[in-house]
Amino acid sequence: MANETLEDAVLASETLALAVELLKRRSVTPDDAGCHDLIAARLQALGFHIERHRHNDVDNLWARRGTASPVVCFAGHTDVVPPGPLEQWLSDPFEPTLRDGKLYARGAADMKTSDAAFVTATERFLARRPDHPGSIAFLLTSDEEGPATDGTVRVVEALKARGELLDYCIVGEPTSAAEFGDTIKNGRRGSLSGTLRVKGVQGHIAYPHLAKNPIHLAAPAIAELAETMWDEGNSYFPPTTWQISNIHAGTGVTNVIPGMVEIQFNFRFSTASTAEGLMDAVNEILDSHGLDYEIDWNLSGKPFLTPRGALCDRLSEAVHEVTGLTPELSTTGGTSDGRFIADICREVVEFGPLNMSIHKLNEHVALENVEQLAAVYEKALEKLLGESDERV
């Protein structure tokens, strides 16, 4: 495999061939760079109804084949983060390169290989089961790595408005940690950010009695916030955390007491808490310290959880049959578009390649994992939509 050329590998793998075509496209957020066109053409040939949902500079693709339940949806993104310093890459990040059994390119792991595997898995399943029960859907966006305000959330809003709900959704995020197939994400913590401004009175630093230092005033409250146990978590989630990300105050000189301090912070919270409850608790602590303050809140995602059930179990079986591993269910990590999809889908999980190189220089995916990933997705379709006596 180490001496295999990319051309030879592409001939041997339909999934790799499509992944390479996607990876050649410089689809840095929010530019889709034609990735949706490639995928839509393949899906249209399979009988999918295609919808384009463009909002501002963001391209979104919704595709569905069938009208019955259950609905199994593959969800993902075609945008990638910027490559960073090109001179520090061993090869052009938008010219896929095979080296030592690994495919190198920006988006190889996060998550164009998953996008390609979605398509080829569906093609193979439909070749065997054209009259399968239920429906298959795709939800793709070019705005997952950016603000995520015009991407998946907009398509979800449109589907919800017309009463179109999903039963199962597999998001192709790179979830594998140490080896391919070791982790399925069956939930994510919520993310609640706040910008706190504590007001004081500006003055000369030599005359503190004529001023009120907002940093000093806020310090005891900050200490209490940092020490507060917000909840104990639960069997799926660790306890909620509160962390300061930035503190800004002062004029840049050493002889002026600032008139205000701005503190930016973030909660990563579990299903054991609510955003409203956390906001109320913060206000209560700040009020108890007698501060003159204001807060701007931003809830970028609620927590979601898919307990063990049909989707977790069937996908775990598929992973085990392909890799021999029994994946761990995990809710660790940051947010994903699963937080939006959970609003219209009763079971949402994430599964994809190794995540060790994502957003890094020389991002890559192991060549052997490319077809393994497609096989897992195909088996998942079979288990969720196929007959029990006919397995992949």
Curated annotation (Swiss-Prot):
Keywords: Amino-acid biosynthesis, Cobalt, Diaminopimelate biosynthesis, Hydrolase, Lysine biosynthesis, Metal-binding, Zinc. The active site is at residues 79, 144. One of its GO terms (molecular function) is acetylornithine deacetylase activity. Zn(2+) 1 binds at residues 77, 110, 173. Pathway: Amino-acid biosynthesis; L-lysine biosynthesis via DAP pathway; LL-2,6-diaminopimelate from (S)-tetrahydrodipicolinate (succinylase route): step 3/3. Binds 2 Zn(2+) or Co(2+) ions per subunit. Zn(2+) 2 binds at residues 110, 145, 359. InterPro entries: Bact_exopeptidase_dim_dom, DapE_proteobac, Peptidase_M20, Peptidase_M20_dimer, Peptidase_M20A. Its cofactor is Zn(2+); Co(2+). Its EC number is 3.5.1.18. The keyword Metal-binding applies. It comes from the Bacteria. Signal peptide: none annotated. GO terms for biological process: diaminopimelate biosynthetic process; L-arginine biosynthetic process; lysine biosynthetic process via diaminopimelate. It catalyses: N-succinyl-(2S,6S)-2,6-diaminopimelate + H2O = (2S,6S)-2,6-diaminopimelate + succinate. Belongs to the peptidase M20A family. DapE subfamily. Catalyzes the hydrolysis of N-succinyl-L,L-diaminopimelic acid (SDAP), forming succinate and LL-2,6-diaminopimelate (DAP), an intermediate involved in the bacterial biosynthesis of lysine and meso-diaminopimelic acid, an essential component of bacterial cell walls. Homodimer. This is Succinyl-diaminopimelate desuccinylase. It comes from Thiobacillus denitrificans (strain ATCC 25259 / T1). The gene is dapE.
